[in-house]
Amino acid sequence: MAIPASRTQSEATVCIETALCTGCGQCVAVCKDFGLRLEGGKACLALHPLFGCVGCGHCMAVCPARAITVHGRGLGPEDLFALPPLSSSASFDAYYALLRRRRSVREFMPAEVEPELVERILDAARSAPTGVPPSDVNVLVLDSREKNRAFASDFCAHLKTLGWLTAPWFLWLMRPFWGKANDGLFRNFVRPALAAFTSSMDAGKNIVTYDAPLVMYFYGSPWADPADPLVAASLAMLAGEALGLGTCMIGSIHPLLQWGGSAARFRKRHGIRCKSREGVVVLFGYPGIHYNKGIERSFASVHRA
């Protein structure tokens, strides 16, 4: 048995060099598939793992004797690397300052984002945790203002095929099925937003993706944990901030690319591999406006049980 993913339908294989094993038991402790056990002072495979090895690599990474290797599900011993020293990590104060300085930026300088910065952002995003490995996150990269404008223009053309979605008759019909909250969302946000997107694009102004010089669209797959692309996008956004770029998350594009023939044709034209439950677009670029003050944010609630 194996947990399926778009990249694999098989479980990974754990190999143990018994002669090297010291019997410390750390691999047994970290395996949450319960696929390892100690026998005779040595690590060995358990008879009844929970799922079959998912390829997280924890056992291989924790072993002090290099006695364990994991192969499969996109993972191999060549993927191990030495951890950076703790002294090189950001302090909480530095991290919190980054968060406090961050604002959603929608005004960008025309300068492109250098290719090496694009790769550093992707490297940071790849480090995101996943619900179950291997990652089923896909990323569409638009690395110029021209590519961004073409994508946004085509998106607005797609929106024009969805007029029924915010038509009064459709909202009236759906009100009993999707409830008061969704009805209010569609009437007060979706309908005016779609109208503004298309009318502004017709007038030559892009208020969908704001002609940012770099756009990344993070999305999953039918097998992905819904949170995975959102977590990866968040790390990409923070990486962009750390590199001196302005960033902005755009959540209005993904939901409108999931259903119907027009959406399927749009996905095919732009190399979007599949539908997914969650996804988000992140804009990057050198900011055209710099803020002098921050604004305090809050949660809807914090309940301490």
For the regions a language model picked out, list residue spans one by one.
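Acidic, surface-exposed loops and disordered segments
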Residues: 1-305
